[in-house]
A protein has these predicted regions:
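Metal/cofactor-centered catalytic core regions of large enzymes
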Residues: 1-406
């Protein structure tokens, strides 16, 4: 019986290769904590992260290009689908940018309602962050508590706009419609019960020693590095930088509200957690003040060539019917110019840049998304961390890939 030998190529001769202490693996997009839309390329030395590189684009939809083929008012529905956990914030930044180009003034009641709805949306966004962040680390129970409270807010948003996740409630020149009858009473009911819910969250998570061990001293970034990386929102304030656009560059009447800019100095996952927890309490305070400031009045600007008329006016005035037809069929011309409008969204600075060459459609729309910028600092935060800590660091940034990929 003959035998044969097979020559093994040198590159596969593992006996003669020195052992390499590093290896490269993919985390996601199938990993539960990356939710199917984010991949990280991790270079590991044992359990320690040497380098992490985010790989994005799994949720790319070409939103910014879509704006160029749609009239200004049609772009509102696109903004809903960026950060789909904070759609009203997206609506607000976009409509305010267009209103700047048009130079139209918004009625006081519409301004107050915008603040009211945005702060409710901020709480809802933070509730999703808290539930999923804790769930990824291993604290399962609080997830259900958070979504119980979020459901109450989504019911309020649905009552006002007809939509839950994609409300498109803010319109260029004001609001889609006024608040429905009994809305203020329903908000007060939510307000009365929310402090008790926050106390439950603290009992379940803040006092959890395992959660503390998983977050304290993890994902550290100094104030100087946070500024250099361009972080904003809770991710920046968690490093002790007191920057909030609602106070530093107030818009839609925020200068009239009393609230604290929440900061924590430690710069780790735990600090960013505490900032968002306290921010929910501050948003609760702002909602209370907005309810007190609500006064009767119009919710649409006096700009008949831009703002759709009421249904009753269309039935009784021919000019209102004509304006409605022209706005829907042809849109409205926006003066040529450029504008950048930033707001303090739930995840940080959300900025909208619009370039108009005149006409009913924008020449260019670009968004400065907080999640995109905050994610860029992940390699810095995760260097030297353990593999298990990556999940906690990602959660502390509160990123949404719909806004990152656009």
């Amino acid at each position: 019986m003959s035998t044969s030998t097979v020559d093994i190529p040198p590159q596969f001769d593992v006996v003669d290769r020195p052992l390499d202490t590093q290896m490269t693996i993919s985390m996601g997009p199938q990993h539960p904590s990356t939710h199917g839309v984010l991949r990280l390329e991790l270079v590991l030395d044992g359990e320690m992260v040497v380098k992490s590189t985010p790989d994005i684009g799994y949720l790319h939809t070409g939103m910014e290009k879509l704006f160029e083929y749609r009239k200004y008012q049609q772009g509102i529905v696109i903004t809903d689908r960026m950060d789909y956990l904070n759609p009203l914030g997206n609506n607000l930044a976009y409509v305010m940018a267009v209103e700047k180009l048009l130079r139209i003034e918004i009625p006081e009641r519409a301004q107050v309602i915008r603040v009211l709805m945005c702060e409710l949306q901020r709480i809802a966004s933070h509730l999703v962050w808290l539930g999923t962040h804790a769930l990824d680390i291993g604290a399962m129970t609080v997830f259900f508590y958070c979504f119980r409270e979020r459901e109450k807010i989504l019911n309020l948003i649905e009552a006002a706009s007809g939509g839950r996740l994609t409300p498109s409630y803010f319109r260029i020149g004001g609001l889609m419609m006024d608040l429905p009858s009994g809305f203020e009473r329903r908000v007060k009911q939510f307000q009365d019960g929310f402090p008790k819910a926050v106390a439950e969250f603290h009992k379940l998570v803040t006092g959890n020693r395992i959660f503390q061990k998983r977050t304290q001293g993890v994902g550290y970034i100094s104030a100087e590095d946070a500024i250099d990386w361009g972080l904003s929102g809770p991710s920046l304030r968690g490093s002790g930088v007191e920057l909030d656009l609602r106070r530093m560059n107030p818009y839609t009447g925020y200068e009239n509200y009393d609230f604290e800019i929440v900061t924590e100095a430690d710069g780790d996952v735990w600090a960013r957690y505490l900032v968002r927890m306290r921010e929910m309490e501050e948003s609760h305070k702002i909602v209370e003040q907005a309810l007190c400031r609500l006064a009767p009045g119009p919710v649409k600007a006096d700009a008949p060539k831009v703002v759709l008329p009421d249904r009753e006016a269309m039935k009784t005035h021919m000019d209102a019917l004509i304006h409605h037809f022209l706005i829907v069929a042809e849109g409205f011309d926006v003066p040529a110019g450029e504008v950048y409008q930033p707001i303090e969204a739930s995840k940080g600075e959300l900025g909208v840049y619009i370039k108009s060459t005149g006409g009913p459609k924008p020449a260019r729309v670009h968004f400065r998304g907080p999640s995109f910028v905050n994610l860029s600092a992940l390699p810095h935060m995760s260097r030297g961390a353990m593999v298990a800590d990556i999940v906690a660091i990602i959660g502390s940034l509160d990123i949404v890939l719909g806004e990152i990929d656009r």
